[in-house]
């Protein structure tokens, strides 16, 4: 009997103890349930290296990189900036960190609509101007992976994950589990623009 009781405890602890530890974890009564699911997904998938080609149609994003880049340069100038600190109070107020929703870019929206593994509701361009750091953090759920395609970047911005560093260089893509540790450091004065997509896992 006792071993059976310890199973859910072990599942929750596996998720809770991932770095960085979320001190507010148990303030949300649903979080331990999500944590058990996260651990089961970790067991099923292992500590995988995620490949774009394993997700149907996702390769089309980088294939159309130049068109996406050109559309961003043209359309973003006409749009109002939306700030991450308004979206989520976890972010400190920073007018140099903002985003544009992907649905305001017709070519990109049409492309995303053709790719079933992409979560259509969260697609956006994230912009960082000047030096900046984003502290270590992780998402609450690992049902989705995160995809980055660097639209603008001179190599002065690095995303650190458990897999090691990924430098945001123009035209390069990266797929990772954002429910595990990641942080960002940008040292230069230039602008970094990344297309961020949440991608459904392929089990």
Task: List the predicted regions and their residue ranges.
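Short, well-ordered turn and helix-capping elements at secondary-structure junctions
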Residues: 129-132, 163, 180
């Amino acid at each position: 009997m006792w071993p059976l009781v310890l199973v859910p405890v072990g599942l929750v602890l596996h998720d809770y103890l991932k770095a960085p530890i979320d001190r507010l974890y148990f303030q949300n009564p649903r979080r331990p349930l999500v944590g058990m699911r996260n651990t089961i997904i970790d067991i099923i998938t292992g500590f995988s290296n995620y490949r774009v080609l394993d997700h149907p149609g996702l390769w089309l994003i980088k294939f159309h990189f130049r068109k996406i880049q050109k559309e961003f340069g043209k359309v973003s100038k006409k749009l109002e900036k939306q700030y991450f600190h308004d979206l989520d109070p976890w972010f400190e107020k920073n007018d140099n960190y903002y985003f544009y929703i992907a649905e305001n870019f017709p070519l990109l929206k049409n492309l995303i609509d053709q790719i079933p593994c992409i979560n259509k509701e969260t697609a956006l361009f994230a912009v960082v101007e000047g030096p900046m750091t984003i502290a270590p953090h992780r998402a609450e759920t690992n049902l989705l992976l995160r995809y980055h395609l660097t639209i603008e970047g001179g190599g002065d911005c690095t995303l650190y994950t458990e897999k090691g560093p990924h430098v945001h260089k123009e035209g390069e893509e990266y797929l990772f589990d954002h429910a595990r540790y990641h942080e960002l450091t940008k040292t230069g004065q230039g602008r970094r623009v990344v297309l961020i997509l949440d991608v459904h896992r392929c089990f």
